Amino acid sequence: MLNANRLVSPSKFSTRPLYLQVRDALAARIAGGEWKPNAAIPNESDLAREFGVSSGTMRKALDLMEGERLLTRRQGRGTFVNDQSSEELAERFSNIHAAEGERIAGESKMLNIVQAPASPAECARLRLRADDKVWRIQRVRLHKGEPFLIEEVAMPAALFPGLDAQEMPNHRIVVLAQQYGILLGRGEERLSIGAASPSVAETLKLKAGSPILVLDRLVHDLDGQAVEWRVGTGHFADKYYLAEIS
């Protein structure tokens, strides 16, 4: 996982391409809190001099970070650190839309949070060892006061120390990641159809056996480490799931 202590400056002894070493060092400044969300960073020339690399190498590193949504260049104003918890960036992990078309995350109702040894399934999905621990979170998402999604979440406990002491541990992964200095990368989501169990039916106000959509999502950090496994069980009578392909 990227962190502020892993890399301070590029090394001539590394076999990793130089622009990737520079990207790692710059990303570590964001993860470590040295560069705050929405803050302007030094210009390309100053950074190239600081790191002792060419302007082309620095530009390539910054281009990559812009593609990873860590930075945004604004013509005539400079380069700024993106707020990973902003609605604009959080949308990439939220594919549920209301009938009117807008994306919805919904309000969250926490049911339970506990730290426990990782199950075999959690070890497999999160790539953990058998003796690792996870945070397990159960919550319900509501839209306009009505429940539409039950979430079962597992996250590596080592990445989120003291999570149960948070005033609002039901934050979305984009918020938690920013709080804990984790830079999010890609996510993947599997969709399947199931039938509502009696307990699910009661929570979602359905008849037992009603068709439900199961959303199995895995979110990784920039280094490819899995940071959240979430299984959502939902009923979208007046909502829909949208996957954009480009």
Question: How should each PLM-predicted stretch be described?
Answer:
Residues 1-53:
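Extreme N-terminal segment that seeds HTH/winged-HTH DNA-binding domains in transcriptional regulators
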Residues 4, 83-246:
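All-alpha effector-binding/dimerization core of bacterial HTH-type transcriptional repressors
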Residues 25, 66-67:
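N-terminal leader/targeting segments and the immediate start of mature chains
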Residues 34-38, 67-76, 82:
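Beta-hairpin "wing" of winged helix-turn-helix
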Residues 42-43, 78, 190:
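Residue-level "edge-of-site" marker
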Residues 57:
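Residues in the helix-turn-helix
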Residues 62-63:
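Short, hydrophobic-biased segments on the C-terminal half of alpha helices
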